[in-house]
């Protein structure tokens, strides 16, 4: 985590932290004004929101990175597919070398590597067979492709809360219950793209890491969610579900980490959560190397971490599945048995019935696609 990010996520920065962030206060004011103006233009219909021709469920957040949005998107897409829907996920594709519209998966299998699709689309494509994944900056264009070319009849808009150019039938906003708003400021002074008052646009609040939140904070967030949306929130924890090798194949039970001395390698917005996961699994984290979010590890970086791990007596270098999909297959193969990957999924603690009801209402309320016009009779 960089020095700036440390200021962002420190809820009570103290005098030195406040002083370090003071120059950014001047930049926060125009960002706040621009965000408010843009929101008002959409609220009043002066900026249009395109209809997709299929129900759209947006998964987003208020802050930048690390809220647990990807596990939530996985869970929502799986539940929609379980209802018999032909699902497509629309993603910005952060971390990709390309910025054009592209199909990462047509539902039959991954078509693009993470370097071209972005790490989150690559992960979603790998984890969700039968679900199409499209990526690019213009999500309305992706929606048309998904509906018209791939036959999708339910769309999941990944990181979509601020992407209001595409209309949606349900806005799910994910908050990290352990630290939902950081220092409370907007970019660049803080981590937030919008203030908490923006939750009034949401249809459902999802509290990730609810198991790590203090009881009084959890109660306050539940009240905030009900006041904003009229619904109780969904609450989840990041549950480790599999231990994989560098090629993302099963590599034994998670219990194998218990008592093992390991090195943690990550490129995440908030790497501390990954360290807590490893410690909860009983691993002894002797070494931790954290890179910026969406970072693609080079051969030199991976080799250096492997050497440090060996020198520290570590059995494995352990990384996340999102990091592993970015890893060049040749590098993963070279690491061999020295590399392990922990998969996590969103385990719902409360609100499964609320989620199902919200999805059902969104599917029922969405405008149905217009039938294609009949050809004139000769």
From Swiss-Prot:
Keywords: ATP-binding, Kinase, Lipid A biosynthesis, Lipid biosynthesis, Lipid metabolism, Nucleotide-binding, Transferase. It comes from the Bacteria. Belongs to the LpxK family. It comes from Anaeromyxobacter dehalogenans (strain 2CP-C). Its EC number is 2.7.1.130. One of its GO terms (cellular component) is plasma membrane. Pathway: Glycolipid biosynthesis; lipid IV(A) biosynthesis; lipid IV(A) from (3R)-3-hydroxytetradecanoyl-[acyl-carrier-protein] and UDP-N-acetyl-alpha-D-glucosamine: step 6/6. InterPro entries: LpxK, P-loop_NTPase. It catalyses: a lipid A disaccharide + ATP = a lipid IVA + ADP + H(+). Transfers the gamma-phosphate of ATP to the 4'-position of a tetraacyldisaccharide 1-phosphate intermediate (termed DS-1-P) to form tetraacyldisaccharide 1,4'-bis-phosphate (lipid IVA). ATP binds at residues 63-70. GO terms for biological process: lipid A biosynthetic process; lipopolysaccharide core region biosynthetic process. Disulfide bonds: none annotated. GO terms for molecular function: ATP binding; tetraacyldisaccharide 4'-kinase activity. The keyword Kinase applies. This is Tetraacyldisaccharide 4'-kinase. The keyword Flavoprotein does not apply.
């Amino acid at each position: 985590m960089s020095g700036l990010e440390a200021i962002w996520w420190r809820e009570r920065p103290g005098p030195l932290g406040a002083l370090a962030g003071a120059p950014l206060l001047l930049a926060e004011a125009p960002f706040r004004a621009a965000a408010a103006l843009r929101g008002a233009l959409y609220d009043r219909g002066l900026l249009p929101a395109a209809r997709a021709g299929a129900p759209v469920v947006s998964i987003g957040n208020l802050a930048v990175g690390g809220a647990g949005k990807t596990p939530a998107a996985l869970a929502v897409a799986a539940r929609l597919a379980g209802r018999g829907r032909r699902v497509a996920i629309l993603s910005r594709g952060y971390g990709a070398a390309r910025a054009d519209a592209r199909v990462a998966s047509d539902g039959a299998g991954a078509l693009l590597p993470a370097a071209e699709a972005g790490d989150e689309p690559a992960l979603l494509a790998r984890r969700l067979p039968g679900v199409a994944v499209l990526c690019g900056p213009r999500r309305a264009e992706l929606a048309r492709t998904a509906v018209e070319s791939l036959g999708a009849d339910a769309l999941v808009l990944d990181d979509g809360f601020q992407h209001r150019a595409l209309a949606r039938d349900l806005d799910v906003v994910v908050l990290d219950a352990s630290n939902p708003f950081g220092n409370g400021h907007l970019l660049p002074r803080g981590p937030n793209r919008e203030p908490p008052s923006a939750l009034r646009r949401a249809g459902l609040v999802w509290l990730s890491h609810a198991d790590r939140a203090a009881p009084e904070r959890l109660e306050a967030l539940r009240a905030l969610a009900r006041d904003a949306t009229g619904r109780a929130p969904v609450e989840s924890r990041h549950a480790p579900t599999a231990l994989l090798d560098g090629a993302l194949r099963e590599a034994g039970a998670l219990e194998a980490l218990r008592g093992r001395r390991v090195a943690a390698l990550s490129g995440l917005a908030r790497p501390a959560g990954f360290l807590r996961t490893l410690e909860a699994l009983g691993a002894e984290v002797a070494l931790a190397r954290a890179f910026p979010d969406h970072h693609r590890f080079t051969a030199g970086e991976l080799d250096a971490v492997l050497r440090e791990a060996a020198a520290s007596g570590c059995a494995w270098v352990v990384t996340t599945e999102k990091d592993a999909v970015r890893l060049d297959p040749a590098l993963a193969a070279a690491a061999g048995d020295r590399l392990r990957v922990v998969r996590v999924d969103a385990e719902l603690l409360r609100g499964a019935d609320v989620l199902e009801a919200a999805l059902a209402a969104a599917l029922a309320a969405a405008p149905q696609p217009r039938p294609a016009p009949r050809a004139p009779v000769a």
